[in-house]
Structure formats: C-alpha cells, structure tokens
Amino acid sequence: MNGKAQVTMYETAEAKKYKKDFTKYIKEQVKIQQFNIIPNKTQHFYCDCVFYFDRIDKDANNYFKLLLDSITDSQCVWLDDNVVCERVNAIYYDSKNPRIEINIYPVDYIGIFQSQEQLSNFTNNCIHCNRYKEGKCSILNKAKEGRILEEIENGKCIKFKCLKEIQN
C-alpha cells in the first residue's frame, strides 16, 4: 500500500439496480421531453433536486451521487458530472409516494464569462490579436474552460497584440 490509504468503492445490488433503472429512465425522458442538448465537455448545468424519501434514515448525498452517475452513464445530457452545479433544494418524507423531482438546465455562464454576449465580445477582440490563430488562442480556450488567468484583467486580455495588418 506504500503508506497510502486505499479506498474501495462498494455499490450494493440495490444501488446497481437503481442506477441501471434510472439510466434507462433518463434516456426515455430525454426523448419524451425533447431535451435537445449535444453533450460536450464545457457546458455546465444546474441540477436542482427535491427528494421525497419513504423514511428518515435515507442519505440524500448517496442518492444524488447515484442520480448524477446515472445521468452521466446515459451520455444524453453531459459527458461527465464534473460540469454539474448540484443543488438539493429540499428533503421531504412521503412514505406513500417516494420520489425525486429533478430540473436540469444549462447555466448562463460559459467558462469565466457571465453570458454568451460577454464571451462573444471577448472573442471578437481576440480575432484581431497575433495570439489568435484559427481559434487556437490558449488564453481564450482556458477562459472558456473556466480557468482563472492572470492574463485576463477586468475582462480584457493583457497579452493582446494587434495584428500588423490592422495597425496599418
């Protein structure tokens, strides 16, 4: 073990069945609700949940993780649950009708940009920079991934160098 703790995840048979059934249900609901999103690595989502458990001793965190894993396994909404902003809005107890109510919707922000408009304005400026070659500016790409960069101050790239053809 090299002096490091080893953790083994264990999924009960009940959890495996829940995950499999829920993955199938997600795929069905995506079609029924016409949730037309092409999964990608940068789009983030809010996942708002209200749990109605049949008894008090249930753990919302475990169910939420299984829920996220099931949605990830479906590959219909997102590719990896690292793009999810998780929000458990309430936990109730309803022995007659246990359920989970889920609302999934895309966030407005894109990376460090608060809106599509802010991203477009930044990108339009980038197009006129020496660093922007066929859309491959590392600063812009990292900013779209949500990385905080020293090169961007107050919404402006401090590494901006105007293309020679525009300067003339």
Predicted segments, located by residue:
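Acidic, proline/glycine-enriched N-terminal capping motif
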Residues: 1-168
